[in-house]
Amino acid sequence: MDLSPVKEALAAKSFDKIADICDTLMLQVASEGIEYHDDWPYAIHLLGYFYVDDCDSARFLWKRIPTAIKERKPEVVAAWGIGQKLWTHDYAGVYEAIRGYDWSQEAKDMVAAFSDLYTKRMFQLLLSAYSTITIHDLALFLGMTEDDATTYVVENGWTVDAASQMASVKKQAVKREQKVDSSKLQRLTEYVFHLEH
């Protein structure tokens, strides 16, 4: 079984392509009738789904993984631990699951990249959902210490009130794009005029 496309994507840090590559290879290997369960990079496959925010597919993959593999490969179980936290929206638990396992060299870079990406996703979620938030809750959402979380949001333009231990969200400017520019509108007007006359 040739897993070189997965290894190449990992080496190139193309983590957003891992899930699709694994899906394609799994279908190819299964259609050829090759026994692949023992050698399959299930942890990487699961992490690939989490990286592209596809918890549904990760959950179905988890259900298809043989019990013997789950019992023999703790990294697969650790990867699924992240999935369980994502599934239940336990934001702080995601970071605990990431830090709670000593990842293999193969998975370490991908887990670190996912952690960074997840922090950015959480920051965007906070940006759209809150006007103010406690420093404690902010640290839980971002998976950081309170000091690091404070520094992170201040660098992104938020204001922090040390007395109340609250952070105020810097609201994004609402961008309103004009759907049709004037030249397109003019051409449409001329076209309709031509059709009517």
UniProtKB/Swiss-Prot annotation:
UniProt-listed Gene3D superfamilies: 1.25.40.990
Organism (species): Arabidopsis thaliana (Mouse-ear cress)
GO molecular function per UniProt: metalloendopeptidase activity
Chain's role: Component of the COP9 signalosome complex (CSN), a complex involved in various cellular and developmental processes such as photomorphogenesis and auxin and jasmonate responses. The CSN complex is an essential regulator of the ubiquitin (Ubl) conjugation pathway by mediating the deneddylation of the cullin subunits of SCF-type E3 ligase complexes, leading to decrease the Ubl ligase activity of SCF. It is involved in repression of photomorphogenesis in darkness by regulating the activity of COP1-containing Ubl ligase complexes.
GO CC terms in record: COP9 signalosome; cytoplasm; nucleus
Domain named PCI: residues: 20-190
Major subcellular location class: cytoplasm
Protein name: COP9 signalosome complex subunit 8
